[in-house]
Amino acid sequence: MATPTLYSYEPVKPHQLRLLKFVDYGTSVSAILKTFSLRQPLPTYDSLSYTWTTNGDVLSKSWNLVIDKQQLPVLDTLRPFIDVLESKGQLLDDRWWWIDSICINQSDVEEKSQQIQHMQHIYSQASRVICWLGEESSDSNIAMEFVKHLDKISRDKYHIDKLRAILQAGEYRAKWAALGNLLSRRWWSRI
């Protein structure tokens, strides 16, 4: 059996970027990377904001994305995100993605520098920016529902004392704890 070939990036010009589309080429996670000009209208794409590491220090790439029959080692922190897309039937929905660790050749210092200069444009032109906070925990749904609840009561015309009493009620302890867990995830402190 032949050793898989590592993916080799084609160079991009300073006014270009790569976008990624997941495709079905068999059992492994596969994709295509295509270069587009920033001077022309871009196809509709989503951008992903996420953390590169889980513990803050070590970049781990223990799985490969197949691109043009070549293997691209990909950050472990992306695998759960891709698995969620797949479980929701959204992995192969013909959507373009901009995911920095894949769309930028991380081995090319000059390209990284050029692409970093375009990040504001890349994120602002995305149809959606998805913030991947990490895998779902046992209290993630509680935290997200509590955020919606806080938004709702913030719009009501409560006097501050009544609002304080509502939010300090014992029934909210678990919800505050869940929200604290959500807000202590690495994504919030990565910059």
Regions found by a protein language model. Name each.
Residues 1-98, 104-114, 135-175:
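Metal-dependent phosphate/diphosphate-handling catalytic cores characterized by acidic Asp/Glu clusters
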Residues 111-117, 127, 178-191:
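Hydrophobic, mid-to-C-terminal alpha-helical segments
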Residues 129-132:
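Short hydrophobic alpha-helical runs that function as membrane-insertion/retention elements
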